[in-house]
């Protein structure tokens, strides 16, 4: 990502104006955008716990400076946009290959350790090529629905594991400690089955050591990412800990993915030995498809590693928050349980999950409301490849623009009682919000490629869990707030009771 900010005095000769901008509107420059001073901005980040409160800083910034403001960190100036209409205006001006703020430390790891970039770290034409390969297998609803049978057995194993974990270390017979940890295992098992076509053992009574190492690395890499991104690169030599930790985490994840990809490659070679290409069997997992497309092993490993990471956090955090909120709103849980049991035959989940469950309005509304309150990625970004206009401001080419999705999804102008869990708001109760107010999966070409798969996993998991259990809060537990760890996570462990129905 180019980090240089263009001078405010530049001539605006390549500005793309929005159609709604009136001819009498006055264009203003980057230097006219309000925002905190650099010392104040840095104090908020490093002296007041701002790195773990980045989502809250979005809300505070919008309240203090309005829908658009800017802040500087060294030579890098970031423009923050916290109004859904302005977010839409910016995203509608995307180029053929939209560029977002790259996780520079991730890209640097790939370069130094000679690893291939996957869909999360690739840019430009390489990103476009990978996206074009993977999108038909993940983004089309019918393609995602094809994994229902695979995921059904994973969800059934999750239910069995929750039964085993009840009462362990808690003194309460139905209490499961740290449900997010259990759902991390579920998320990895599910995405692993889709990507690799094999089970990883995450939900067994004894989890394989390399799987435990991978799960720990996923949690650790987001913490080290925040630290390394906040530090200038020259500081990595003086304070080597965060960078060394990030490299260790990524190396462990790459080793895990490489081991399983090579196993699939070896199995395919034995199975297909001596057969002409037209007679080779078709596989249903993504690694098989990438091999057939003659993608290099190094590139397959890079993509599998990054997709495993993305799949784990999206499902585990959203499922944790969903059951947390449902446990605190028993009337919603009861209504959802009735909707599920009234529409689905528990004996035929694998056949009905992708069809019947996706048509249940309250189930979809619960997931949508959870993602509004707790978007996995609280903010997104774009780096325009030309001068663009956002509101009445000209944003120069190569300026980092942060889209404050957490702030827009809790905007009282868009959502009545925005901090309250109310799935009914998505069922026609009250005025409809701006369509860009809540964008948990992003928008356009850079939208989350695993959206359909994540929604399917969440629907299937909630359906089976609520069919088997009534979920209750931990007795006497205080409310749990979110915190930023690159992604949005619970600030402390969530413990829940799973009572047999």
Curated annotation (Swiss-Prot):
Heme binds at residue 448. GO terms for biological process: bone mineralization; calcitriol biosynthetic process from calciol; calcium ion homeostasis; calcium ion transport; decidualization; G1 to G0 transition; lactation; negative regulation of bone trabecula formation. One of its GO terms (cellular component) is mitochondrial membrane. InterPro entries: CYP11_CYP27_families, Cyt_P450, Cyt_P450_CS, Cyt_P450_E_grp-I, Cyt_P450_sf. The keyword Metal-binding applies. It is found in: Mitochondrion membrane. Its cofactor is heme. It is an enzyme of class 1 (oxidoreductase). Pfam families: p450 (PF00067). Its main location: mitochondrion. The keyword Transit peptide applies. Keywords: Heme, Iron, Lipid metabolism, Membrane, Metal-binding, Mitochondrion, Monooxygenase, Oxidoreductase, Transit peptide. Its EC number is 1.14.15.18. CDD domains: CYP27B1 (cd20648). It catalyses: calcidiol + 2 reduced [adrenodoxin] + O2 + 2 H(+) = calcitriol + 2 oxidized [adrenodoxin] + H2O; secalciferol + 2 reduced [adrenodoxin] + O2 + 2 H(+) = calcitetrol + 2 oxidized [adrenodoxin] + H2O. Disulfide bonds: none annotated. Kidney. Pathway: Hormone biosynthesis; cholecalciferol biosynthesis. Belongs to the cytochrome P450 family. Catalyzes the conversion of 25-hydroxyvitamin D3 (25(OH)D3) to 1-alpha,25-dihydroxyvitamin D3 (1alpha,25(OH)(2)D3), and of 24,25-dihydroxyvitamin D3 (24,25(OH)(2)D3) to 1-alpha,24,25-trihydroxyvitamin D3 (1alpha,24,25(OH)(3)D3). Is also active with 25-hydroxy-24-oxo-vitamin D3. Plays an important role in normal bone growth, calcium metabolism, and tissue differentiation. This is 25-hydroxyvitamin D-1 alpha hydroxylase, mitochondrial. The gene is Cyp27b1.
């Amino acid at each position: 990502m180019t980090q240089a900010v263009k001078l405010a005095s530049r001539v605006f000769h390549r500005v793309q104006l929005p159609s709604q901008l009136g001819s009498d509107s006055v264009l203003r420059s980057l230097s006219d955008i309000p925002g905190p001073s650099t010392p104040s901005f840095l104090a908020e980040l490093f002296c007041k716990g701002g790195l773990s409160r980045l989502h809250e800083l979005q809300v505070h910034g919008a309240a203090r400076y309005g829908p658009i403001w800017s802040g500087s960190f060294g030579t890098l100036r970031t423009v923050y946009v916290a109004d859904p209409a302005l977010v839409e205006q910016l995203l509608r001006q995307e180029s053929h290959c939209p560029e977002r703020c790259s996780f520079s430390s991730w890209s640097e790891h790939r370069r130094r350790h000679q690893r291939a970039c996957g869909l999360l770290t690739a840019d430009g034409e390489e990103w476009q090529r990978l996206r074009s390969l993977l999108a038909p297998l993940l983004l089309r609803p019918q393609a995602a629905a094809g994994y229902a049978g695979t995921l059904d057995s994973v969800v059934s194993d999750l239910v069995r594991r929750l039964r085993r974990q009840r009462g362990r270390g808690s003194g309460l017979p139905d209490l499961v400690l740290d449900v997010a940890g259990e759902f991390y295992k579920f998320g990895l098992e599910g995405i692993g089955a889709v990507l690799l076509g094999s089970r990883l053992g995450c939900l067994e009574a004894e989890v394989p050591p390399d799987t435990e190492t991978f799960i720990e690395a996923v949690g650790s890499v987001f913490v080290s990412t925040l630290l390394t991104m906040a530090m200038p690169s020259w500081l990595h030599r003086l304070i080597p800990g965060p960078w060394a930790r990030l490299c260790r985490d990524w190396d462990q994840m790459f080793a895990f993915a490489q081991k399983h990809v090579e196993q699939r490659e070896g199995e395919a070679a034995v199975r297909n030995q001596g057969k002409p290409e037209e007679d080779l069997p078709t596989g249903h997992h993504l690694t098989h498809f990438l091999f057939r497309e003659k993608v290099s092993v190094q590139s397959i490993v890079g993509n599998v590693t990054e997709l495993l990471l993305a799949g784990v956090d999206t499902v585990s955090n959203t499922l944790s928050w969903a059951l947390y909120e449902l446990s605190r709103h028993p009337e919603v849980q009861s209504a959802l349980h009735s909707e599920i049991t009234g529409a689905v035959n528990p004996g035929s989940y694998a056949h009905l999950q992708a069809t019947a469950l996706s048509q249940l309005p309250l189930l979809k509304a619960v997931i949508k409301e959870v993602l509004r309150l707790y978007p996995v990625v609280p903010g997104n970004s774009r780096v325009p490849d030309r001068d663009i206009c956002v509101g009445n401001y000209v944003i120069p080419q190569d300026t980092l623009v942060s889209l404050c999705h957490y702030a827009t999804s809790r905007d009282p102008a868009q959502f009545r009682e925005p901090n309250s869990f109310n799935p009914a708001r998505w069922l026609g109760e009250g005025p409809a919000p701006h369509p860009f107010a809540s964008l948990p999966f992003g928008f356009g070409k850079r939208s989350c490629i695993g959206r359909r798969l994540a929604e399917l996993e969440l629907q299937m998991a909630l359906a089976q869990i609520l069919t088997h259990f009534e979920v209750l809060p931990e007795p006497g537990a205080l409310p749990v707030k979110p915190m930023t760890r690159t992604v949005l996570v619970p600030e402390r462990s969530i413990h829940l009771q799973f009572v047999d129905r």
